[in-house]
């Protein structure tokens, strides 16, 4: 019998979900767009400030983990728990929460990664440092190339230790 994800140790999870990098895939943009539309189908429009494709899959020139990162910004007056509950009801798993930030994932199964995997970063409006990082890499190809080299150099060394890799 396969253990449920929530019953696995961190080490077991790292074995099941190793770090894996791929050359940029054009389909990642499509995955983001399809998931964005799906999110818009169940989240109240007035509770969305912005949805953004972030992370390495949003930078077309670099290798990345085949996991699409999405940032969802909500108005500061919104009860984050309401959005959390809607995400949980629609297939997302809450991974962590702290001081006005929640992280979710989708596509992690007891037998490994699903075909499409997403990390969703729920934030209050204006808490979006990842957008600056994404934009900087997109606007500075030499820096993006250095970042890619760093990622590739750490990949195999920390393949089964996500904390050390990041």
Task: Please report, for each region that a protein language model flagged, where it lies by residue.
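Catalytic cores of NTP-dependent nucleotidyl/adenyl transfer enzymes across multiple folds
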Residues: 124-166
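Short amphipathic alpha-helices in soluble, non-transmembrane regions
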Residues: 82-90
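Short histidine-centered catalytic/ligand-binding loop motif
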Residues: 17-27, 71-73, 133-137
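Helical scaffold of the NTase/Pol beta-like nucleotidyltransferase catalytic core
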Residues: 1-52
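Short glycine-aromatic motifs
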Residues: 46, 91-92
């Amino acid at each position: 019998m396969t253990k449920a994800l929530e019953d696995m140790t961190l080490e077991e999870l790292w074995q099941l979900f190793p770090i894996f990098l791929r050359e940029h895939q054009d389909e990642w943009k499509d995955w983001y767009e399809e998931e964005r539309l799906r999110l818009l189908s169940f989240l109240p429009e007035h509770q969305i400030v912005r949805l953004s494709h972030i992370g390495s899959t949003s930078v077309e020139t670099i290798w990345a983990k085949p996991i699409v990162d999405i940032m969802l910004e909500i108005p500061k007056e919104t009860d984050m728990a309401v959005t959390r509950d809607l995400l949980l009801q629609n297939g997302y798993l809450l991974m962590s929460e702290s001081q006005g930030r929640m992280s979710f994932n989708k596509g992690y199964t007891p037998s490994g990664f699903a075909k499409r995997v997403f990390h969703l970063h729920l934030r209050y409006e204006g808490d979006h440092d990842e957008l600056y990082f994404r934009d900087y890499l997109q606007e500075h190809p030499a820096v993006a190339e250095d970042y890619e080299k760093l990622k590739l150099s750490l990949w195999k060394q920390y393949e089964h230790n996500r904390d050390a890799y990041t």
